[in-house]
Amino acid sequence: MKWMTRARPKTDRIACPWLIRGFIDPDAAIIYAHADEVIERARAEGARTFDAPGAEFTHRDNKCSFEVLIDEFDLAKDNPALMRLAKIVHAADIAADRGSDPLAAGLEAIGVGGLDVEADDQLLFERATFVYDALYAWCQREVGSRAT
């Protein structure tokens, strides 16, 4: 399936496709488009939309798109590590809640800095996937250590 969002991804627009490929649609084709073209182009291409104005999955009720996807696809069940990651992504993406998680500033810095390092959005996403894989692994360790 095709999934489309706004170009020049950082934080939420990197976290969401990581979540989509890892937990929702492993074969997802992630497409980055100009913000004013996302909805119309997605309709024409039969793509699902996220983290864009008017998108199917976007910020709502003080939740970032990553959290909305987790809720919509019922991914929180039995996955405390994913919920820990969601708190970090939320704190890095939602301006009113910045600073609510100690790891958020680092994730936000990586997201913003990534835009300066890589001009190609697809390559930026592919390169940033490692960061989310590593952070999710840390979250698994973190929640696992609290459970024992």
Task: Describe the function of each predicted region.
Residues M1-R8, W18-T148:
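Extended, well-folded catalytic/binding cores that form a central cleft or groove in large enzyme
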